[in-house]
Regions:
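An acidic-aromatic pocket/loop used at catalytic or ligand-binding sites
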Residues: 2-6, 20-143
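N-terminal, intrinsically disordered, basic low-complexity segments enriched in Arg/Pro/Ser/Thr
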Residues: 10-11
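C-terminal motif of bacterial Sec signal peptides marking the signal peptidase cleavage site
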Residues: 15-18
Length: 143
C-alpha cells in the first residue's frame, strides 16, 4: 500500500511539473531584433512577452499587417496609457478609446488601422492583442 501511495505522489509531482514548464520556443520576450523591426511603427512595452502561437506578422517595418499577441506585466491603466501615448508618438492617430475590463484603442496611419485590445489577467498581468489591417476603402457609388 505504501508503494502505491508513493507512486501516486511521484506521478502527481511529475504531472504538476510538466504543466508548470514552458515549452522551448513557445513564447519569447520582445527581443531587440523584434523591437527594431517594429521601431518607429508600433511601440512594444519593455519586458513584453510575445505569444508566438497567437502571432502572425506579414511584411516588415512600416508596412506590416497581422496580429501580435503579448503578455505585458503592470497595471491595466499603465499599459493602456503606454499605448495611448506611444502610438501617436509613432505617427498613429487615435480614433477611439475605451478603458474598461476589456479596453480598446483604435488608431489609423496611412492606409492601415490598428486595434489594440487589452484585458487584465488574474495574475497581475495583461493580455494585449494588436491587430493591424488595411483600412477599408469607401465604395464608389455610380449614379
Amino acid at each position: 500500500m505504501t508503494t502505491t501511495k508513493l507512486l501516486l505522489v511521484l506521478f502527481a509531482a511529475l504531472v504538476a511539473a510538466a504543466c508548470a514548464s514552458t515549452p522551448i520556443g513557445s513564447d519569447s520576450t520582445v527581443t531587440e531584433a523584434t523591437a527594431k523591426q517594429l521601431s518607429g511603427d508600433v511601440p512594444l512595452p519593455p519586458g513584453a512577452v510575445i505569444k508566438q502561437q497567437d502571432t502572425l506578422v506579414m511584411s516588415a517595418a512600416s508596412t506590416w499587417l497581422g496580429r501580435i499577441s503579448l503578455s505585458v506585466s503592470g497595471e491595466p491603466q499603465a499599459v493602456f496609457t503606454y499605448f495611448k501615448d506611444g502610438m501617436p508618438a509613432s505617427g498613429w492617430t487615435l480614433t477611439s478609446s475605451s478603458f474598461s475590463k476589456t479596453s480598446l484603442l483604435t488608431f489609423t496611419k496611412g492606409e492601415r488601422v490598428a486595434n489594440i485590445q487589452m484585458q487584465g489577467t488574474s495574475f497581475g498581468g495583461n493580455d494585449v492583442l494588436i491587430t493591424v489591417a488595411p483600412a477599408a476603402r469607401p465604395v464608389n457609388s455610380r449614379p
